[in-house]
Amino acid sequence: GALDVEIAAVIGNHDNLRELVERFDIPFHCVSHEGLTRVEHGKLLAEKIDEYAPDYIVLAKYMRVLNPEFVARYPNRVINIHHSFLPAFIGAKPYQQAYERGVKIIGATAHFINNELDQGPIIMQNVINVDHTYSADAMMRAGRDVEKTVLSRALDLALHDRIFVYKNKTVV
């Protein structure tokens, strides 16, 4: 089913999704990180986010590490979708990492961000089976549906106040 949610805005650090987002009458803002420190970029990003006062912030295709000040400003409100079954294959190119290891399952993880890369409290995960015939690209294509499902389920839990965070774990 559909999520009962209002997307207040999409904020990216590249302008490449503007046209797509604006087709849905959703405001798009580009807050470039070029020439800025992580702290400077985080401050500009937070200022733009705060204009909308969202309940939650979703990181999807946002491939930048956010600074501790940004993380502290939005505790347990920033949800990241990572395209692996964490804690396996942290960081960039997890499908390539999975392919190189010859895994038999791939997955996706939605988690709250913290100051450690891809190590925040896990909200939702799911996996699918793969085999030796899958290339890294085939894994990536197969994983897209898993990522969408995991993110939507995590958002549904968050929006219905069904997540309790204790230490670095969640109870849902």
Regions flagged by a language model, labelled:
Residues 11-14, 24, 41, 56-172:
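Donor/substrate-binding cores of folate-linked one-carbon enzymes
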Residues 6, 27-29, 77:
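Conserved beta-strand segments of alpha/beta enzyme cores
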Residues 1, 51-52, 73:
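Alpha-helix C-cap/termination motif
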Residues 22-54:
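Adenosine-nucleotide cofactor-binding segment
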Residues 16-20:
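Short, charged/polar "capping" segments at the starts of alpha-helices
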